């Protein structure tokens, strides 16, 4: 199984570069993980961008401290098990979760942990 892990995608230029790469090479991978905490202009991630990532066959979005920069994402974090906050942030005081298990395109379950 081939897994692509992409570090910090920053702003629109980072998203455009990622999408261009995935357009050419995306089918080569069975599972794609992207750090999206700075994908909204270098500060946080929006629900629109998260949905955009998932539409590009990105399986899980990880994050760090900048996940909190856009308050609109808080509800999305609670509802999604594919957008992760850092695991080592206090449970109960921060929305979402820091780990997930998602089935790959090959039918293999993949565990992902987001820690900062």
Predicted segment positions?
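Acidic, metal/ion-coordinating pockets
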Residues: 1-116
């Amino acid at each position: 199984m081939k897994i692509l892990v992409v570090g910090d995608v920053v702003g629109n230029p980072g998203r455009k570069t990622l999408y261009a790469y995935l357009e050419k090479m995306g089918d080569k991978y069975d599972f794609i993980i992207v750090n999206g905490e700075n994908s909204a202009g270098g500060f946080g991630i929006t629900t629109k961008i998260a949905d955009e990532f998932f539409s590009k066959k990105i399986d899980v979005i990880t994050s760090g401290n900048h996940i909190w920069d856009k308050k609109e994402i808080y509800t999305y974090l609670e509802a999604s098990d594919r957008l992760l906050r850092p695991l080592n942030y206090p449970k109960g005081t921060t929305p979402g979760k820091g780990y997930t298990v998602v089935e790959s395109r090959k039918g293999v379950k993949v565990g992902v942990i987001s820690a900062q």
